[in-house]
Swiss-Prot record:
Processed by the macrocyclase-peptidase enzyme POPB to yield a toxic cyclic octapeptide. POPB first removes 10 residues from the N-terminus. Conformational trapping of the remaining peptide forces the enzyme to release this intermediate rather than proceed to macrocyclization. The enzyme rebinds the remaining peptide in a different conformation and catalyzes macrocyclization of the N-terminal 8 residues. There is a cross-link at residues 11-18 (Cyclopeptide (Ile-Pro)). Belongs to the MSDIN fungal toxin family. InterPro entries: Amanitin/phalloidin. Keywords: Toxin. Probable toxin that belongs to the MSDIN-like toxin family responsible for a large number of food poisoning cases and deaths. Residues 1-10, 19-33 form a propeptide. This is MSDIN-like toxin proprotein 2.
Length: 33
């Protein structure tokens, strides 16, 4: 079971992480401006 979770987590997080990075970057840039 742990092996299955280890292989699934990167697949699930792959599309989510870029979205979070975009949000953080947008907030940082707007705050600096």
């Amino acid at each position: 079971m742990s092996d299955i979770n280890a292989t699934r987590l990167p697949i699930i997080l792959a599309p989510i992480i870029p979205c979070i990075n975009d949000d953080v970057n947008s907030t940082l840039t707007s705050g600096e401006r």
